[in-house]
Amino acid sequence: MGPNGEFEFHETCPIDKLVRAENELCALIGPQKAFEMGVAGMKYAESPPGVTDIVTAMQMFDAAYHINHLENGVPMFDPETGTMREGIGHYRCLSISRHRAVMEVDVPYPCDFDRGLIQSWARRFERTALVTHLEPSVCRKNGAPRCRYEVSWK
């Protein structure tokens, strides 16, 4: 914590340690608080250039995720070249329409934390956005390799 009571992010943190800590913390605090932690964490995230509406935001979520992760001090997505480094999973926008997107997620972070991240990101662009876990039986909590979420808005 910083002097103003806000959480202070350091420029780099090894991804394996960060993921392990987040998974342990989310297991301790439970699904609702993990969701809230994801919502809060998104306020610190950098947005790729050109994201101005919810449709573009959902299509660019994976780029935003990679921009906000560093490998050897370099963002894992370069918007100027379109180069994306692998190794931390993806947030794929499988389909999108005027009021709905389906996201497939295979990142190492906890499912409930991801729901919070996605909802917070979507609400930057559309305040009515709501995230629902599709196929709850197919979930990383149960050992599945991915989760799917529906993002809907009015």
Task: Name the predicted role of every residue range.
Residues 81-115, 123, 127-154:
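Short terminal or interdomain "cap/linker" segment that borders an active site or interface and mediates
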Residues 2-111:
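Amphipathic interaction/junction segments at domain boundaries or subunit interfaces
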